[in-house]
Regions:
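Extracellular interdomain linker/stem segments of modular secreted and single-pass surface proteins
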Residues: 21-28, 181-184
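Short, conserved sequence motifs used for protein processing/export or organelle targeting and
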Residues: 5, 14-16, 62-260
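The N-terminal extracellular segments of secreted preproproteins, especially immediately downstream
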Residues: 21, 40-43, 251-253
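Extended acidic/polar, glycine-enriched regions
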Residues: 1-24
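Local sequence-structure signature of Cys/Sec-based thiol-disulfide redox active-site neighborhoods
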Residues: 25-68
């Protein structure tokens, strides 16, 4: 106690050790936002509109919009369903989101309702967590280049990078690569008075659901070739890549180190 006496109630005391590193400079990280929503979610359009209103000011934000968490729909891919693992075992819901798959419950105890990194998707929550993540340096680089052949609709993708700062678990890092598409129009979106445009929809995962193991200490370089389906609009397609830790027994230990 502040008066040097005994703590009258010591059951609420807790301590946590944190490592602090001082450097002259660091590489700015990109922050990964993974949204979970579906066409059957009546609350999702309002949440999407609110989030879309604040993201233009977030220059370092990378987005993926999984169609899972509340049933599935025409835009769902298997990998998105696999990520329902980040929900508590007793409850899935939408709209929901992950920010860098980070467990930030100690920093924001009022925002996190469950024992996993998943939280309700809202502009307020996003702004708070994005601001905190922008203060964390990138631990690895993620460099992305593409080569598009319009005649064959083939896309070559190169992803490379290396370690920037010490990493606690370098042997458990995985690379994830997605093809996403914007401006997908739906006439069956619950909660929308008319049609609704879906953004950042994963069309294909080029790596397994839980990523491809990479050695960031030696530097990594991966090449992918994919042919875009005829119904995919290449003008609205983009490649998303990120490196994250993977612990198959703990969804709170799968944080993203950097994205592109």
């Amino acid at each position: 106690a502040v008066n040097d006496g005994s703590d009258a109630v010591d059951t609420d005391n807790w301590t946590e050790a944190q490592n602090v590193m001082c450097r002259d400079s660091y590489v700015q990280r990109k922050v990964l936002l993974e949204l979970f929503s579906t066409e059957r979610c009546t609350a999702c359009p309002e949440a999407h509109h609110a989030i879309d209103a604040v993201t233009p000011d977030m220059d370092n934000l990378i987005e993926v919009g999984h169609h899972a968490g509340f049933y599935t729909d025409q835009f769902t891919i298997d990998e998105s369903v696999a990520y329902e693992w980040f929900y508590p075992s007793y409850h899935v819901f939408a709209p929901a989101m992950l920010i860098d798959r980070m467990d930030m419950r100690n920093a924001f105890p009022s925002l996190f309702k469950y024992e996993t990194p998943i939280m309700s998707a809202s502009a307020t929550n996003l702004k708070a967590l994005y601001a905190l993540e922008q203060k964390r340096p990138a631990l690895v680089t993620v460099d992305l280049t593409t080569d598009w052949n319009p005649s064959s609709r083939s896309l070559g993708i190169d992803v490379s990078g290396e370690q920037l700062l010490p990493i606690a678990t370098p042997d458990s890092l995985r690379l994830y690569v997605f093809l996403t598409e914007d401006s997908l129009y739906s006439t069956s979106q619950a909660g929308a008075s008319a049609g609704f445009y879906h953004r950042h929809v994963p069309r294909k995962s080029l790596t397994p659901a839980w990523g491809e193991k990479v050695d960031v200490t030696a530097g990594y370089n991966r090449h992918f070739d994919v042919t875009l389906n005829d119904e995919w609009d290449e003008k609205h397609m983009r490649v998303v890549a990120f490196v994250a830790n993977y612990n198959s027994t703990d969804p709170c230990d799968c944080s993203v180190l950097n994205a592109a």
